């Protein structure tokens, strides 16, 4: 991206996309298993190559690509101490603790919002569905079924999961050939693998492609 911070001050740098955009969620039986929930020089291991790059598995061109894996979030618990960053599921939704404290004796967070009070805890609605999605960036390829990664958003566990999705932009899939601003979103389109798909950012947050269900969340649309 090209940034202008002064009359004669210009900077050209690579965009660091936040959590996406992604291709469609996996529908095969192939699982991905992260070795750790956080950190760098971690590994993600696939149970098979099915569903990964057209059945060819991980490629060296996947370096720099994002991988997102979903685990069931921990259930909210009554009268429990939570620290900032803790993620729980309650009432069919997923919430992140943004103010540490002790949860209420019953009920817990519900609905959508950025500051949901739960006794002296405060929660932020993340998404519906009860799944905690973490994501990592590929830093190396060991084989067609294993890559090394840096975890950017904490995974919900280290179990093998079929809920995963691969980044839409990479040397493997191609990068967008077209870009435009529209209604406070930054849209990208024209990748080699998905030439008819539009990827729109979160409203007013041009590098944020975190999947969600709110009105201002990122959008993906494929022309028929």
Question: Where do the model's predicted regions map?
Answer:
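Broad, structure-driven detector of short, well-ordered beta-strand segments within folded domains
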Residues: 1-2, 179
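Short, tandemly repeated low-complexity microdomains enriched for cysteine and small residues
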Residues: 105-117, 121
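Generic preference for flexible, low-structure residues
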Residues: 18, 26-28, 33, 111-113, ...
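Autoprocessing Asn-cyclization modules and mimics
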Residues: 2-4, 9-104, 122-159
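Beta-propeller and closely related beta-pinwheel folds
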Residues: 161-185, 189-224
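Residue-level marker of intrinsically disordered, low-complexity segments enriched
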Residues: 25, 42, 47, 114-115, ...
């Amino acid at each position: 991206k090209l940034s202008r911070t002064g009359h004669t001050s210009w900077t050209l740098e690579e965009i660091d996309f936040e959590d996406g955009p992604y291709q469609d969620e996996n529908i095969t039986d192939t699982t991905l298993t992260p070795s750790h929930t956080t950190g760098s020089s971690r590994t993600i291991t696939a149970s098979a190559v099915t569903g990964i790059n057209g059945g060819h598995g991980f490629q060296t061109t996947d370096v720099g690509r994002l991988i997102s894996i979903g685990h069931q979030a921990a259930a909210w618990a009554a009268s429990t101490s939570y620290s900032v960053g803790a993620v729980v599921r309650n009432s069919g939704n997923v919430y992140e603790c943004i103010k540490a404290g002790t949860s209420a004796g019953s009920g817990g967070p519900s609905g959508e919002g950025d500051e949901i009070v739960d006794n002296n805890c405060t929660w932020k609605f993340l998404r519906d569905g009860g799944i905690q999605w973490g994501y990592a960036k590929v830093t190396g390829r060991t084989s067609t079924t294993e890559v090394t990664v840096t975890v950017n958003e904490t995974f919900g566990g280290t179990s093998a999961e079929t809920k995963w999705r691969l980044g839409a932009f990479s040397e493997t899939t191609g990068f967008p050939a077209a870009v435009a601003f529209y209604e406070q979103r930054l849209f990208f389109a024209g990748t080699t693998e998905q030439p008819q798909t539009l990827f729109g950012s979160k409203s007013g947050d041009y590098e944020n492609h975190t999947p969600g269900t709110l009105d201002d969340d990122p959008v993906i649309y494929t022309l028929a």
